[in-house]
Structures are given as structure tokens and as C-alpha cells.
UniProtKB/Swiss-Prot annotation:
Its main location: cytoplasm. Pfam families: Hexapep, NTP_transf_3. InterPro entries: Bifunctional_GlmU (IPR005882), GlmU-like (IPR050065), GlmU_C_LbH (IPR038009), Hexapep (IPR001451), Hexapep_transf_CS (IPR018357), MobA-like_NTP_Trfase (IPR025877), Nucleotide-diphossugar_trans (IPR029044), Trimer_LpxA-like_sf (IPR011004). It comes from Actinobacillus pleuropneumoniae serotype 5b (strain L20). Catalyzes the last two sequential reactions in the de novo biosynthetic pathway for UDP-N-acetylglucosamine (UDP-GlcNAc). The C-terminal domain catalyzes the transfer of acetyl group from acetyl coenzyme A to glucosamine-1-phosphate (GlcN-1-P) to produce N-acetylglucosamine-1-phosphate (GlcNAc-1-P), which is converted into UDP-GlcNAc by the transfer of uridine 5-monophosphate (from uridine 5-triphosphate), a reaction catalyzed by the N-terminal domain. This is Bifunctional protein GlmU. It is found in: Cytoplasm. It catalyses: alpha-D-glucosamine 1-phosphate + acetyl-CoA = N-acetyl-alpha-D-glucosamine 1-phosphate + CoA + H(+); N-acetyl-alpha-D-glucosamine 1-phosphate + UTP + H(+) = UDP-N-acetyl-alpha-D-glucosamine + diphosphate. It comes from the Bacteria. In the N-terminal section; belongs to the N-acetylglucosamine-1-phosphate uridyltransferase family. In the C-terminal section; belongs to the transferase hexapeptide repeat family.
Length: 457
């Protein structure tokens, strides 16, 4: 099988974005557009990915530093053909070269596989699409059904402007052919640029076949030159993802008000209310219910869990039949066992909470281990930070911590202990002990509250 390398054009400035950020770093579904393209190139087993960069190259390299790409500088942006000329020295004669665009993030693996399979032995496979309104796009010129040329909008005559089949810019040919044609490009056109589309005419002159393959959906080859187009790509992507989930059995209360910015795996009878955001890798068990306005990122949720509205869960694990929220926050390292309750305005960070334990109101539990069947009252704080270092709080099983208590770490509270409301616990507590730490209550007879003094005019 012929090896494949991919060239991704990503040197454009993106003037119409009105942004300091390079165009290809603007995001769709929480991920830079160019990252989508790189990921798709990996899916089709590209041997090498050549990334053409220019404007904002330092930031681009910084953001994509972990990607195994060959960085190719295009110092001047003189057209798509000029960009390919910069990468040509890296092409092997006997490999196929696939040309993609860093600002067209929704191209699919399936479409690219169809295109590559259609490439003639000594020719080009070209991806096209038919549009109701083709204004602005290069027109596909055919003779007897075969593609003989691509004419850019600015160079097209009146008859050519009526053509609805347009060029997407995506094509594949052999390394040897590309190197030959790229060496003969010129800029004799209205823009004074080197067009990659000119290689189509060159291929015909050499007697090579140009095979056109139509994309199944225009939006998968659409680029984003401004924020309006970027928003359209985002909506199309989200609509597509929502439809896949609906067909897989997930109930989305309103598919138009659901965003996924990563991957979601799920069990049966999952229900997701409006304005929920999924980020990173999220796993949902069976019969999970997620209330309105929740954000879930890189988390695992067990069967029969209910997440009430406006809760945020990040890098956390929630066990079966737990109840979360409303307005709860589970931060990285939170691990809740089954049948736990975490209520409104509770924050849990880097802490384990045992089976059946309840942390229901206005509480912070950080750097802690909480055993099973505990009750943590309202306003309880694990004081884990002394301004320089963090320390751990360990709470055993069947512990009751009264409201407004402070547990000053490092501290251990053994099984069955009871902490009275308002206690400040600085020393370890033994099994079944009661701790009370409060000022004795005083009663002052005849007390009168101060009254406001009137200010003279």
C-alpha cells in the first residue's frame, strides 16, 4: 500500500477574525481548528504531517508543541501553490500527498478515505462540492465529464461563473507529480499569487486523469475566515453530535441547547437537560440524569446518579446512586462512593467521600478522606492550607460533624466521633468521642440594643 503524507496549510493571518490569535487556533467545540485537522490526519494513518505556518508561528508552535509534525515556514503568503512549494522538498516521489486546510476543521476520515481510494495511479483526486450559491469559490471546468481546470472567481468569465460545482482545495497526488507541477507554477493571474489549482491543467497537459469526488456535506469542507463562519461551523458540529447521541438513545431535552467539546460515552436511559456542557472525556452510566446548566469535564459518573442544576464536575469520579447539587462543585481528585449526597454550594477537591455519606450544604472538603455514613453539617471547612503547605484531614466511618466547624489539618477524627456545632478541631479525636469547642453561653439581663443617633442639619 502506498504511504501517505499530509500537508496542512496554516499560515494565514485571519484578518477578518479581528484577533491577535492566528486564525487556525480559533476553536470549534473547544479545540483549535487546526487540531481537528491534525487529529483527522492521524486517523487516516498519515506517515508524516507537514504543517505550513507563517503568521503567529511562534504561538502556533507553542500550542501544538506535543504534535509530531514537520514545521514548514511560509515567510510570505503568496498563495496556496506557494505554500505547497515550501513543503515540496520533503515529498518522497513514491508516496501520496494529501493537501488539507487548517481552517476547515470538520473534514471527516470517511470523506478523505473515499478521496484517497479514488486517486488514479498517475493522476489527481480532487474533492469538490455543488453549491446553490457558488460565489467566491473556484469553479470546476469539465470537458466530456472530466475535470480539465479550476478557475478562481476573480479570473472566471460570465459562463464559468454559472457553474455550481466548486473546488474545496482538498486534493491528493503522488509526491513526484506534485514536485514536477509545483516547480512550473506561475503567478500570471489577477491576484499575482501561485494557485495550487493550476496543477489541474498541468495534469491534463501531461495526459493524467483528474478524478473528482464530491463531499457528502458542504460544511465538512467549509473554512472559517470570520467569526460568523466560525459560529456556523460550531453550530453544525454541535447539531451533528446531538443527532448522534439522540440516535444512540440519549434524551436531550433540547438538542439545540447542548454543547459537547470532547467525547461522551454513555449507558441507557440517560437524560440531559438544557445548557449542559460536556468537555474532555466524560463517561455516564445507566439512568444518569443531568440538570440544566451543568458542566462536566473529564469525569466518570456511575449508574443512577442525579446531577441537579448548575453543578460543575471536573476530573472527578461519582459512584452509583449519588446525588449531586444543585450548585455543587467537584474539583480535580474528588471521588465519591455510591449513595453519597453532595448538596448546594458544596466544594470538594482532592478528597474521597465514603458510601452513604452526606455533605449537604455550604461546605468545603479539600485534601481529605471521609468514611462511610458520615454527616458533614452546613458551613464545615477542612482547613487544609497554612499559607505555604497543604495538609490532610481524615474522617472515619459514622462520624457526625456539626455545622460551622473547622477541621484544622493535619487532623484525624476516628470512627463514631461527634463534633459539636461551631467546634474548631486542632487535635486528633478518638473513637466515639464528643468534641465541643465553644465559648460558654452568657445571658445578660436588661440588654438594650444601640439606637441610631440623628445627625443635626
Amino acid at each position: 500500500m502506498t504511504q501517505l503524507s499530509v500537508v496542512i496549510l496554516a499560515a494565514g493571518k485571519g484578518t477578518r477574525m479581528y484577533s491577535d490569535l492566528p486564525k487556525v487556533l480559533h476553536t470549534v467545540a473547544g479545540k483549535p481548528m487546526v487540531q481537528h485537522v491534525i487529529d483527522t490526519a492521524k486517523q487516516i494513518d498519515a506517515k508524516q504531517i507537514h504543517l505550513i505556518y507563517g503568521h503567529g508561528g511562534e504561538l502556533l508552535q507553542q500550542r501544538l508543541s506535543s504534535e509530531p509534525v514537520n514545521w514548514v515556514l511560509q515567510a510570505e503568503q503568496l498563495g496556496t501553490g506557494h505554500a505547497m512549494q515550501q513543503a515540496a522538498p520533503f515529498f518522497a516521489d513514491d508516496e501520496n500527498i494529501l493537501m488539507l486546510y487548517g481552517d476547515a476543521p470538520l473534514i471527516t476520515k470517511e470523506t478523505l478515505e473515499r478521496l484517497i481510494a479514488a486517486k488514479p495511479a498517475n493522476g489527481i483526486a480532487l474533492l469538490t462540492v455543488e453549491l446553490e450559491n457558488p460565489t467566491g469559490y473556484g469553479r470546476i471546468i469539465r470537458e466530456n465529464g472530466s475535470v480539465v481546470a479550476i478557475v478562481e472567481q476573480k479570473d472566471a468569465n460570465a459562463e464559468q461563473l454559472k457553474i455550481r460545482e466548486v473546488n474545496t482545495g482538498v486534493m491528493v497526488a503522488s509526491g513526484a507529480s506534485f514536485k514536477k507541477w509545483l516547480a512550473n507554477l506561475n503567478n500570471n493571474n489577477a491576484q499575482g499569487e501561485y494557485y495550487i489549482t493550476d496543477v489541474i491543467a498541468m495534469a491534463n497537459q501531461d495526459g493524467y486523469k483528474v478524478q473528482a469526488v464530491q463531499a457528502s456535506e458542504f460544511m465538512e469542507v467549509e473554512g472559517a475566515n470570520n467569526r460568523l463562519q466560525l459560529a456556523a461551523l460550531e453550530r453544525f458540529y454541535q447539531k451533528t453530535q446531538a443527532e448522534k447521541l439522540l440516535l444512540a438513545g440519549v434524551r436531550l431535552i433540547d438538542p439545540a441547547r447542548f454543547d459537547i467539546r470532547g467525547s461522551l460515552t454513555h449507558g441507557k436511559d440517560v437524560e440531559i437537560d438544557v445548557n449542559v456542557i460536556i468537555e474532555g472525556e466524560v463517561k455516564l452510566g445507566n439512568r444518569v440524569r443531568i440538570g440544566a446548566g451543568c458542566v462536566l469535564k473529564n469525569c466518570e459518573i456511575g449508574d443512577d446518579v442525579e446531577i441537579k442544576p448548575y453543578s460543575v464536575i471536573e476530573d472527578a469520579v461519582v459512584g452509583k446512586a449519588a446525588q449531586i447539587g444543585p450548585f455543587s462543585r467537584l474539583r480535580p481528585g474528588a471521588n465519591l462512593a455510591e449513595e453519597t449526597h453532595v448538596g448546594n454550594f458544596v466544594e470538594i477537591k482532592n478528597a474521597q467521600v465514603g458510601k452513604g455519606s452526606k455533605v449537604n450544604h455550604l461546605t468545603y472538603v479539600g485534601d481529605a478522606e471521609v468514611g462511610s455514613n458520615c454527616n458533614i453539617g452546613a458551613g464545615v471547612i477542612t482547613c487544609n492550607y497554612d499559607g505555604a503547605n497543604k495538609f490532610k484531614t481524615i474522617i472515619g466511618n459514622n462520624v457526625f460533624v456539626g455545622s460551622d466547624s473547622q477541621l484544622v489539618a493535619p487532623v484525624t477524627i476516628a470512627d463514631g466521633a461527634t463534633i459539636g456545632a461551631g467546634a474548631t478541631v486542632t487535635k486528633d479525636v478518638a473513637e466515639n468521642e464528643l468534641v465541643i469547642s465553644r465559648v460558654p453561653q452568657r445571658h445578660i439581663q436588661g440588654w438594650q440594643r444601640p439606637t441610631k443617633k440623628k445627625i443635626a442639619d
